[in-house]
Amino acid sequence: MWGARRSSVSSSWNAASLLQLLLAALLAAGARASGEYCHGWLDAQGVWRIGFQCPERFDGGDATICCGSCALRYCCSSAEARLDQGGCDNDRQQGAGEPGRADKDGPDGSAVPIYVPFLIVGSVFVAFIILGSLVAACCCRCLRPKQDPQQSRAPGGNRLMETIPMIPSASTSRGSSSRQSSTAASSSSSANSGARAPPTRSQTNCCLPEGTMNNVYVNMPTNFSVLNCQQATQIVPHQGQYLHPPYVGYTVQHDSVPMTAVPPFMDGLQPGYRQIQSPFPHTNSEQKMYPAVTV
């Protein structure tokens, strides 16, 4: 990346130096061709003298002014000796006009102003500068590393997901619902002995469906205060998702296992629950009781 940028910068500098050399050559050529033009004239002997561009071949570079008189014209650098060619009447050839040059009295015979060559050279210089600036800007913009669009995203969209607890998948809920029957005996004994009053929750925190707070299998998460009623209703976990860890290892017996008589303390169980024998033999005659699951 940096090597490409350095190469682009060096190429831009080379292009700038080449433009400077070209402009210097143009300025030199323009300075040489920026002198006045001395029109042809008839000398004292009646011989026609062809006009020339100042400076001439043997003149200095600063001899850009047409000086002298109407009968003798030459190039010089003094503005005081400048010849007013408009006041001369011997600079028009009789018959045909000057070859390669328009007649002075014609529509195209006026002398070219001095500032025109400088104006042309300056315009070319400014055009080259503008073109070089545009090329450099385009190169820098193309070689600039692109920003990752994911970095510009605000991290505030994940705050809500951080507050929501992890909800097990459907397979976990199915497996846990099959293990609910193993805890029916212990939970029903605690429910019949004395049911505790469900904790009161303010209606401003969360709106739950009726009967949810009276269910002893639900452990309500503590992060529902940031959600509205509709979201809280959708995220209420299944009854079998929060079970006591000691009951995870028990399995469900098949229908082929002989059923035993229902003890008296299981008369108040909910419909659909039945007692399941534990696959592990008890060392004592007394039935091992587990603590009840509370909210």
Curated annotation (Swiss-Prot):
Name of one Pfam family that matches: Shisa_N
Membrane topology: Single-pass type I membrane protein
GO cellular component: endoplasmic reticulum; endoplasmic reticulum membrane
Cytoplasmic-side positions: 132-295
InterPro entries tied to this protein: Shisa, Shisa_N
Compartmental location: Endoplasmic reticulum membrane
Record keywords, A-Z: Developmental protein, Endoplasmic reticulum, Membrane, Signal, Transmembrane, Transmembrane helix
Name of the protein described by the UniProt record: Protein shisa-2 homolog
Positions with biased composition (Low complexity): 169-197
Regions crossing the membrane: 111-131
Signal peptide as annotated in the record: 1-33
Extracellular side: 34-110
Family per record: Belongs to the shisa family.
Organism of origin: Homo sapiens (Human)
Major localisation: endoplasmic reticulum
One biological process term in Gene Ontology: negative regulation of Wnt signaling pathway
Region (Disordered): 87-108, 168-205
Alphabetical list of PANTHER family matching this protein: PROTEIN SHISA-2 HOMOLOG, SHISA
Role description: Plays an essential role in the maturation of presomitic mesoderm cells by individual attenuation of both FGF and WNT signaling.
Keyword rRNA-binding: no
Organism domain of life: Eukaryota
